From Swiss-Prot:
One of its GO terms (biological process) is methylation. One of its GO terms (molecular function) is demethylmenaquinone methyltransferase activity. It comes from the Bacteria. Belongs to the class I-like SAM-binding methyltransferase superfamily. MenG/UbiE family. Pathway: Quinol/quinone metabolism; menaquinone biosynthesis; menaquinol from 1,4-dihydroxy-2-naphthoate: step 2/2; Cofactor biosynthesis; ubiquinone biosynthesis. Its EC number is 2.1.1.163, 2.1.1.201. Methyltransferase required for the conversion of demethylmenaquinol (DMKH2) to menaquinol (MKH2) and the conversion of 2-polyprenyl-6-methoxy-1,4-benzoquinol (DDMQH2) to 2-polyprenyl-3-methyl-6-methoxy-1,4-benzoquinol (DMQH2). Pfam families: Ubie_methyltran. It catalyses: a 2-demethylmenaquinol + S-adenosyl-L-methionine = a menaquinol + S-adenosyl-L-homocysteine + H(+); a 2-methoxy-6-(all-trans-polyprenyl)benzene-1,4-diol + S-adenosyl-L-methionine = a 5-methoxy-2-methyl-3-(all-trans-polyprenyl)benzene-1,4-diol + S-adenosyl-L-homocysteine + H(+). CDD domains: AdoMet_MTases. The gene is ubiE. This is Ubiquinone/menaquinone biosynthesis C-methyltransferase UbiE. InterPro entries: SAM-dependent_MTases_sf (IPR029063), UbiE/COQ5_MeTrFase (IPR004033), UbiE/COQ5_MeTrFase_CS (IPR023576). Transmembrane segments: none annotated. It comes from Rhodopseudomonas palustris (strain HaA2).
Length: 253
């Protein structure tokens, strides 16, 4: 329950905690139709390689063994589609996202890819999932958890819905740790990405928020501690591309 007067960050702004989700929703309503194109432009296509690392780490079964994936904040379906391609006939994914526009893009793409029988799309909140305890074989969230107002609640919910022996994977932007790269990365992030957003989507402000939100996300070690506090074991992370992103892993034992 939100305490009166509680605040959180929305990019570099402090906002009432209860207002953040609405503000985040407005961002993704604005960019949904061009979201995947913008990912390509902003990362120079690197997001595809990072997601490939995530799917390789997930290592879903390639036979007909049943495997249920919960892909949270996965609106356009990119992670679930990649996982389906790497899986066997027993694969089923639930894409859960709070944003209806992102989900609609995902549903259309699932039909186009003939994956609508394996990938379902459900509107839901990462902080209060509607799924039963111990019901999924894996949980993925890619570039989404930093937009959740109460990350601690989302992590506890992730732990709750996973079966014992199942894995949590979170792909998220991180802190550049290569000398010289940080300045270049900051220049590109703050000067170039919002302008790409303005040209492609007509919305520079949403991409300014996304850039700022990356800087406010916890360092890998701090996020790892949050995972442990939520109940995850064998917590670790893999830094990619000089620290631009990190793949976080934990297990429900």
């Amino acid at each position: 329950m939100t305490e009166p007067g509680q605040t959180t960050h929305f990019g570099y702004r402090d906002v009432p905690l209860q207002d953040k989700q609405t503000l985040v929703n407005d961002v993704f309503h604005s960019v949904a139709s061009r979201y995947d194109l913008m990912n390509d432009l902003m990362s120079g296509g690197m997001h595809r390689l990072w997601k490939d690392v995530m799917i390789t780490t997930l290592n879903p079964p390639r036979d007909d063994q049943p495997f249920r994936l919960l892909d949270v904040a996965g609106g356009t379906g990119d992670i679930s589609f990649r996982a389906a391609k790497a899986s066997g006939a027993g694969f089923q994914a639930t894409v859960c996202d709070i944003n209806t526009d992102m989900l609609e893009v995902g549903r259309q793409r699932a039909v186009e890819r003939h994956l609508d029988g394996q990938v379902e799309f459900v509107e839901g909140n990462a902080e209060a999932l509607q799924f039963p305890d111990k019901s999924y074989d894996a949980y993925t969230i890619a570039f989404g958890i930093r937009n959740v107002p109460r990350i601690d609640l989302a992590l506890k919910e992730a732990h709750r819905v996973l079966k014992p022996g199942s894995r949590f994977l979170c792909l998220e932007f991180s802190s550049v740790d290569v000398p010289g790269l940080a300045k270049i990365y900051d220049l590109f992030s703050f000067k170039v990405i919002p302008q790409i957003g303005r040209v492609v989507t007509g919305d520079a402000e949403s991409y300014q928020y996304l850039v700022e939100s990356i800087r406010k996300f916890p360092k890998p070690a701090d996020f790892g501690e949050m995972m442990r506090e939520a109940g995850f074991a064998r917590v670790n992370w893999q830094v990619l591309s000089g620290g631009i992103v990190a793949l976080h892993s934990g297990w429900r034992l």
